[in-house]
Design a protein with these regions (language model features):
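Zn2+-dependent peptidoglycan hydrolase active-site motif and core
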Residues: 17, 26-29, 43-88, 113-115, ...
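Polar/charged, compositionally biased leader and regulatory segments
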Residues: 1-17, 24, 76
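Short, well-structured beta-strand-loop connectors
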Residues: 40-52, 89-104
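Conserved, short, structured surface segments that act as functional micro-motifs
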Residues: 60-73, 93-141
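Short coil-to-beta-strand transition motifs
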Residues: 2-8, 39-46
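Short, solvent-exposed alpha-helical surface patches in non-cytosolic proteins
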Residues: 142-192
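Acidic/polar residues in short coil/turn loops that connect beta-strands
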Residues: 75, 123, 165-167
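A residue-level detector for short acidic-glycine micro-motifs
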Residues: 14, 35, 51, 83-86, ...
Length: 192
C-alpha cells in the first residue's frame, strides 16, 4: 500500500467512479483522501514535475483542481495532486516516491480540506483507478500501512544517512543471505 502523505494512515472520503455530487450523478476520476496525522502530501511515484500551479480562471478546465501538482511518472503516466494549500515543487523538478509535493488544502472546487489524487494514462485523458497504484481499496474508509519489519526500518536508516540509495536490492538479497540481514541491522544501529 502507498499513502501519498507523510502519514501511516489515510481516509478515503470519495472513491473512483460514479458518485452523486450536488444532486447530480458524476464520474469521479480519482480518490479524495485525507491524511491522518499529517497534511504533507508526498509523491506516490518518482518522475518529473510537469505542472505546478494555481488555477483560478474558471474558463480553464482544471480550475476545479485549484492549486495542484502533476507528476509525469517514470512509467509514463500522469499523477495529479489537487486542492493543495501550498506547493513545495516547481515545474521541471525531479521527484522520487515519498518526496514532499505540498500541503493538503481546499482550493478550487472543494468542500473541505483533502487531496484529490488522480492518475491518467500516457494519452493524458484516460483515468486509472487509483486502487491499482496505491493499493487502497475503492471504498470509503480509513486505511493504515502495515507495520514495517526490523529489516525495513534498518534500511530506512541507511537510506536516510546516504549509506545506500535504494532499499529494494537489499530487501531482495537479505532474505537469501542470512548474515546480510544482521550486517544491515548492525550498520543501522551504528549510525543511530
Amino acid at each position: 500500500m502507498i499513502i501519498p502523505f507523510k502519514a501511516s494512515s489515510v481516509k478515503l472520503t470519495s472513491g473512483y467512479g460514479s458518485r452523486i455530487l450536488g444532486g447530480k450523478t458524476d464520474f469521479h476520476g480519482g480518490y479524495d483522501l485525507v491524511g491522518v496525522g499529517s497534511t504533507d502530501v508526498t509523491a506516490a511515484v518518482g518522475g518529473k514535475v510537469a505542472v505546478s500551479r494555481m488555477v483560478t480562471d474558471k474558463s480553464n478546465l482544471t480550475w476545479q483542481w485549484g492549486n495542484y501538482v502533476c507528476i509525469l511518472g517514470d512509467d509514463g503516466r500522469y499523477y495529479y495532486y489537487c486542492h493543495l494549500a501550498s506547493r513545495a515543487v516547481n515545474k521541471g523538478d525531479t521527484v522520487k516516491a515519498g518526496d514532499k509535493l505540498g500541503v493538503m488544502g481546499s482550493t478550487g472546487y472543494s468542500f473541505g480540506a483533502h487531496l484529490h489524487f488522480e492518475v491518467r494514462e500516457k494519452n493524458g485523458r484516460t483515468t486509472v483507478n487509483p486502487e491499482t497504484i496505491l493499493g487502497i481499496p475503492n471504498k470509503v474508509g480509513t486505511y493504515t500501512l502495515p507495520a514495517k519489519s526490523q529489516l525495513e526500518r534498518d534500511l530506512d536508516v541507511l537510506v536516510a544517512r546516504g549509506v545506500i540509495k535504494t532499499p529494494e536490492y537489499w530487501q531482495q538479497t537479505a532474505p537469501k543471505v542470512q548474515y546480510l540481514s544482521k550486517l544491515i541491522h548492525n550498520m543501522a544501529e551504528a549510525l543511530q
